[in-house]
Amino acid sequence: MEVILLERVAKLGQMGEIVKVKDGFARNFLLKRKKALRATAENKAKYEGMKAELEANNIKAKGEAAKVAEKIDGRDIVVIRQASESGQLFGSVSVRDIVDALAADGITVSRPQVWLDAPIKTIGQQKVTIAIHPEVETSVTVTVARSADEAERIKRGEDISTRQEDRDAAAEAIAAAGEFFDPEAQEEAAGEPAAQ
């Protein structure tokens, strides 16, 4: 089916272009969401009549989207979740969680505007793209951690797989175990010469 695009559609075309798409995509997505018109002679004439209005509305919406993008751009969102010692989350961080975190900061975006390939299932940082307008995109950094302290350590770039206190305790335990099993250290403590 041929359609006339009423706005820019990613990987398809710009506003005003006549493109050929599959019937299901046209009916279920483009026409339903008023992103396109069927490319009939009547609709082509109708589009030419409303072209100036559509372009003016697009420029206005793009300007508003640019203002919102400035607020969002480079923002760091922290999401606290329970996770195993290996960093696997007990659950996941989805688009809904990102939208809710932005809403808590006073920024309103809808779920379809957040582009997340798959839910986040591990602790760490991930860049997420937000398309506020078909021509305006920005990104945020989502930091997933077990606690606020751990989130700060992740932001600083520290290795969070093991804590520094745990590494120090392990080194002390190895040193103590080495003395415990060293026969010379045991004999010196007992005051006896080493038997050979």
Swiss-Prot record:
Alphabetical list of PROSITE patterns matching this protein: RIBOSOMAL_L9 (PS00651)
Pfam family, one: Ribosomal_L9_N
Superkingdom of the organism of origin: Bacteria
Signal peptide positions on this chain: none
Keywords: Ribonucleoprotein, Ribosomal protein, RNA-binding, rRNA-binding
Gene Ontology process terms (BP): translation
Coiled-coil residue windows: none
Molecular function as annotated in GO: rRNA binding; structural constituent of ribosome
Cellular component annotations (GO), alphabetically ordered: ribonucleoprotein complex; ribosome
This protein's record includes keyword Thylakoid: no
Function, as annotated: Binds to the 23S rRNA.
NCBIfam families on file: L9 (TIGR00158)
HAMAP family: Ribosomal_bL9 (MF_00503)
Family, per entry: Belongs to the bacterial ribosomal protein bL9 family.
Protein name: Large ribosomal subunit protein bL9
